[in-house]
């Protein structure tokens, strides 16, 4: 009977959580009414002043609304001015017949959208010979005018068209079949197979750059990692329904911003061990055990995952039940205290952040651990609260690792934000046809997301790369590639994204 009751309670909990996820707010922010449980400010909350406070004078004033912000956002755009004025024969005063003079102007701004346009650029290279040598029947030297090498020999692809298709798919999540339709409206008959070939060939140019970015990434001592699923239809030895994986590796708050994606057919921990071979330092991860195979690193856990489990346990409670005194709310409050401290330390130095954490965060962790150990024996292991408690206890060494260095972060949200563009794109184009296509997509995403992290315009940067990479004598020359990296000071200003 007790077992049936426990199962019923579990199913009811799962139902309430599923209902909340489907119809409720998706935010994990704590409701203001839940903040009454204050763990470490009890003395301040309960204290009463010994003496009467001096009266305070309330000063009220009206803030002037700042002006010019809308116009300032347009400063980076070209301006076309259309002037409306009276002709000379119209500048006559209706009262006295005198000549009217210009007194002032009235101005309004409008944004005009210019749809995508296409044109043919015909490259004509002239060949020269010497007339005198021709007349005197001497060996005639032939001189050919220099011409840039094409980005895709034998095709209609240009640096701009290849960059445009990549940006549409990997930044704006437009599948190739939709781009095929868009080009048709421009009067261009370009099949999605042709567009796919452009992407594959472009990824070949970008691959040495991504390899160079990986070399820089492995030199850092703090990294973040995450993984998500990807369906590849023609994976050798696997059915079309089987999930493959896209792994993410990126730098932290220090060092150059680098975001790399790596396609692998499985979720085996050997993949991050291989990719991160040679890396020594701290690795921010979630609770997946596969990262334990990475040697020579200190794993740093994610408090956002731990907090989310207590948040789900709280949301799954019956609607009429008071939540402020529940164990789920207490566990969530511990997590909120830690995040509140981190918000205060957002702009301080790593040394100061480490000192404050040891002074304020460490006591919270010690109290939380004692609370978890006490609650574990009181809670059903399979309940959402039991799972939240078990997760925190099982991950405790990783969850407390952020105390070791002030540069470390409380959560792994940095990697989750970086993997989100791929997840959004996946909802639109759903799958990759082949492993080769999946690897090409990982390469392109790596360049684009790193460029965005560096404040670059993805289209302009890709266009610049496809103009420069074919001209390199050695496309794998480290020094030449370093000048093309997203954080390089050698990049032209045209690659920069306009500041909003």
Feature map (PLM): residue ranges:
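Catalytic center-proximal scaffold of phosphoryl-transfer enzymes
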Residues: 69, 90-91, 101, 125-500
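Short, flexible loop/hinge motifs at secondary-structure junctions
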Residues: 1-156, 224-225, 231, 251, ...
């Amino acid at each position: 009977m007790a077992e049936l009751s426990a199962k019923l309670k579990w199913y009811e909990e799962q139902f309430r959580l599923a209902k909340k996820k489907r119809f409720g707010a998706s935010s994990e922010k704590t409701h203001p009414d839940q903040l009454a449980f204050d763990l470490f400010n009890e003395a301040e909350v309960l204290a009463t002043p010994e003496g009467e406070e001096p009266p305070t004078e309330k000063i009220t004033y009206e803030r002037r609304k700042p002006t010019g912000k809308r116009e300032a956002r347009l400063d980076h755009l070209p301006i076309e001015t259309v002037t409306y004025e009276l002709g000379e024969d119209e500048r006559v005063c209706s009262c006295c017949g005198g000549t009217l003079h210009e007194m002032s102007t009235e101005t309004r701004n409008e944004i005009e959208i210019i749809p995508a346009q296409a044109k043919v650029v015909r490259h004509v290279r002239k060949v020269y010979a010497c007339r005198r040598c021709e007349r005197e029947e001497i060996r005639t030297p032939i001189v050919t005018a220099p011409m840039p090498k094409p980005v895709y020999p034998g095709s209609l692809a240009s640096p701009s068209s290849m960059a445009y298709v990549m940006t549409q798919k990997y930044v704006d999540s437009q599948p190739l079949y939709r781009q095929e339709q868009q080009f048709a409206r421009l009067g261009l008959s370009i099949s999605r197979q042709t567009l796919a070939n452009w992407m594959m060939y472009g990824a070949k140019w970008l691959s040495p750059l991504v390899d160079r970015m990986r070399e820089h990434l492995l030199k850092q001592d703090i990294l973040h990692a995450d993984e998500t699923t990807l369906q590849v239809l023609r994976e050798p030895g696997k059915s079309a329904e089987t999930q493959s994986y896209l792994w993410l590796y990126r730098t932290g708050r220090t060092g150059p911003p680098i975001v790399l994606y790596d396609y692998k057919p499985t979720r085996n921990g050997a993949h991050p061990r291989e990719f991160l071979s040679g890396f020594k330092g701290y690795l921010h991860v979630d609770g997946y055990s596969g990262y334990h195979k990475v040697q020579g690193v200190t794993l740093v856990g994610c408090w956002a995952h731990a907090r989310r489990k207590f948040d789900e346990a709280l949301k799954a409670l019956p609607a009429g039940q008071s939540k402020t005194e529940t164990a789920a709310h207490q566990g969530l409050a511990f997590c909120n205290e830690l995040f509140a401290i981190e918000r205060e330390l957002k702009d301080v130095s790593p040394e100061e952040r480490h000192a404050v954490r040891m002074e304020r965060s460490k006591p919270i962790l010690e109290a939380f651990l004692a609370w978890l150990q006490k609650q574990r024996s009181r809670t059903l292991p399979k309940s959402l609260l039991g799972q939240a408690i078990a997760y925190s206890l099982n991950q405790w060494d990783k969850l407390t690792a952020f105390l070791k260095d002030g540069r470390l972060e409380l959560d792994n949200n940095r990697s989750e934000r970086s993997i989100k563009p791929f997840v959004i794109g996946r909802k639109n184009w759903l799958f990759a046809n082949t492993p080769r296509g999946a690897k090409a997509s990982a390469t392109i995403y790596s360049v684009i997301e790193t460029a965005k992290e560096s404040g670059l315009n993805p289209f302009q940067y890709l266009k610049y790369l496809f103009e420069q990479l074919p001209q390199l004598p050695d496309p794998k020359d480290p020094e030449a590639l370093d000048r093309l990296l997203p954080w390089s000071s050698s990049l032209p200003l045209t690659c920069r994204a306009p500041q909003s």
